[in-house]
Amino acid sequence: MKNEVKFMSEVIKVVDVKIFPHRYLKAETTEKVLNEIYDLDGIVRVIVHGQPLPKTVPFGPARGLPVNHQDRKVIKVKGEEMELRVKVGEIIITVEGEKLEKIMDGIEEICKRNFPFGYDIYVGAFTKIKPTVTDYMKYGDISSIDPRLIGMVDASARLKDSVKMIK
């Protein structure tokens, strides 16, 4: 199940690894896990997914009032600060195919250490690797964009509000 992505004029075979903790993660745990994942060699990109943590109440009688959720915090990943806008329920890691076995050992160790409540790990293709129509609409000529952005676009959102690139 290896896919190919052109990355800086060379072809890299990539595989996605999905970590599915049995509980939502707190901001502190998310920060710790992401930093440990980024310490592994061969990581192409990491996507966190989960329930949104809005700044304001989106509907109902309290519409527009601020939501002071304890997990909507600024976390530091690899020295870069980012606002955590979701209650993390899954982490998708795109890895270089040649390093999959070594990375899987590291991911398994990270999960055992940080998720005492249990977790599942899946290997497969969970992200887009070929440009979508929305990518063309958002970026136009996609030959000049970072390949890690392929399939990450929300047509109605500003890029800086929806994607945070960690290098």
Curated annotation (Swiss-Prot):
Disulphide bond pairs: none
One GO BP annotation of this record: methanogenesis
Keywords: Methanogenesis
Keyword ATP-binding among UniProt keywords: no
Subunit structure, interactors included: MCR is composed of three subunits: alpha, beta, and gamma. The function of protein D is not known.
This protein's name: Methyl-coenzyme M reductase II operon protein D
Organism expressing this protein natively: Methanocaldococcus jannaschii (strain ATCC 43067 / DSM 2661 / JAL-1 / JCM 10045 / NBRC 100440)
Taxonomic lineage from the root: Archaea, Methanobacteriati, Methanobacteriota, Methanomada group, Methanococci
Gene that produces this protein: mrtD
